């Protein structure tokens, strides 16, 4: 477990955008490497959703839609090396790592929503958190079909 401390909301947004980009790259890579149609479709959908999340977060950051107040936010991250791995792994292990990543993303967006005062942005962040939870649930369902 690694602790990351953020000093401003913009720091959190930049980190979230970077994580979304890693997820996009990873899910796209997984979609291209699997021969299972259902799993490929799931990976492609996850990548598409993460592209949308990145665009939303980038817009919030670039348009200064969120007040960049000073914060002291600590996020406990369990490193998900699967995003950075180029080697092929067991599909179940890959899915389990993706599940952990989605759980962490959900928590991060909920934590950020809790310290945000703007109600519109708060709803956006909670929606993204909800979608990350739905990703986790989809991955769990896919994992169960492979057991």
Predicted regions and their residues:
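Membrane-interacting alpha-helical segments
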Residues: 1-13, 81-92, 142-147
């Amino acid at each position: 477990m690694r602790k990351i401390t953020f000093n401003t909301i913009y720091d959190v947004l930049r980190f979230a955008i970077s994580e979304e980009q890693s997820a996009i790259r990873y899910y796209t890579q997984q979609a291209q490497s699997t021969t299972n149609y259902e799993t490929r479709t799931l990976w492609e959908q996850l990548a598409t959703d993460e592209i949308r999340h990145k665009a939303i977060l980038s817009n919030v950051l670039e348009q200064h839609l969120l007040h960049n107040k000073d914060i002291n936010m600590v996020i406990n991250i369990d490193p998900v090396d699967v995003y950075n791995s180029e080697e092929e792994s067991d599909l179940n292990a890959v899915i389990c790592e993706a599940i952990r990543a989605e759980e962490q993303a959900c928590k991060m967006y909920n934590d950020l929503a809790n310290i945000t005062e703007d109600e519109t942005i708060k709803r956006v962040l909670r929606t993204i958190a909800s979608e990350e939870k739905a990703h986790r649930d989809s991955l769990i369902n896919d994992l169960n079909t492979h057991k």
